[in-house]
């Protein structure tokens, strides 16, 4: 299955659970992409209770594709949080996936 998870919130627990699901799907050999959008691009800074940074790194190590909206990153002056992308890529991911989840 091709799964797309869009994280559009910087709420650490939401992002943490999204990456937990993405990791589970990757473990089951699904083709998984996570796209950070809106304030979701800020979630990788979290190293607190939910430590989104670590769980996102685990996702990448499993071969998951992690992308962030370049406009969202630039407007927050975050630098390189992960590979930068755009809405054209998000559109393609949505069009090609079997399931899309927005959190």
What role is predicted for each listed range?
Residues 1-6, 24-28:
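Long, hydrophobic N-terminal alpha-helical segment
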Residues 3-16, 41-47:
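Short, glycine-rich nucleotide/cofactor-binding loops
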Residues 14-28:
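Histidine-anchored nucleotide/phosphate-binding helix
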Residues 20, 48-54, 83-86:
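Charged helix-capping and loop-helix junction motifs
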Residues 29, 63, 97-98:
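Short, well-ordered alpha-helix to beta-strand connector turns
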Residues 32-38, 66-70:
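Short internal beta-strands
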Residues 49-75:
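A glycine-rich helix N-cap at a beta->alpha junction
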Residues 74-103:
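C-terminal structural segments of small proteins and small subunits
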